[in-house]
Amino acid sequence: MKFEAVLRTDLGKGASRRLRNTGYFPAIVYGGEAAPVSISLNHDDVMNQMDKPEFYEAIVLVIDGQEVKVKPQDVQRHAYKPKVEHMDFIRI
């Protein structure tokens, strides 16, 4: 399973809200020896794959052309809408 991710340079609550209004959501990739990286993912692409068991085993994120193998660590969902607010990924 592979997703295209975009590096985020605009951080903070306001930037995250603007990002969610465009159909993307914020996420972070951490772990291993590399520094944590803030990214954004397409909401619809991820939501369509979240009901599959493979989603929670291993994912490949393409971040600016570089493939990173990750596993979802945490998912923050909206209180009553079927939306993802934020995700944490850990490198494997």
UniProtKB/Swiss-Prot annotation:
CDD domains xrefs: Ribosomal_L25_TL5_CTC
GO biological process: translation
SUPFAM superfamilies, sorted: Ribosomal protein L25-like
This protein's record includes keyword Ribonucleoprotein: yes
Molecular function as annotated in GO: 5S rRNA binding; structural constituent of ribosome
InterPro entries with a match to the protein in the record: Rbsml_bL25/Gln-tRNA_synth_N, Ribosomal_bL25/Gln-tRNA_synth, Ribosomal_bL25_short, Ribosomal_L25_dom, Ribosomal_uL5_bac-type
Keyword RNA-binding recorded: yes
Keywords, comma-separated and alphabetical: Ribonucleoprotein, Ribosomal protein, RNA-binding, rRNA-binding
Protein role: This is one of the proteins that binds to the 5S RNA in the ribosome where it forms part of the central protuberance.
Family from the record: Belongs to the bacterial ribosomal protein bL25 family.
HAMAP family per record: Ribosomal_bL25 (MF_01336)
Subunit note: Part of the 50S ribosomal subunit; part of the 5S rRNA/L5/L18/L25 subcomplex. Contacts the 5S rRNA. Binds to the 5S rRNA independently of L5 and L18.
Protein name (record): Large ribosomal subunit protein bL25
Native species: Vibrio cholerae serotype O1 (strain ATCC 39315 / El Tor Inaba N16961)
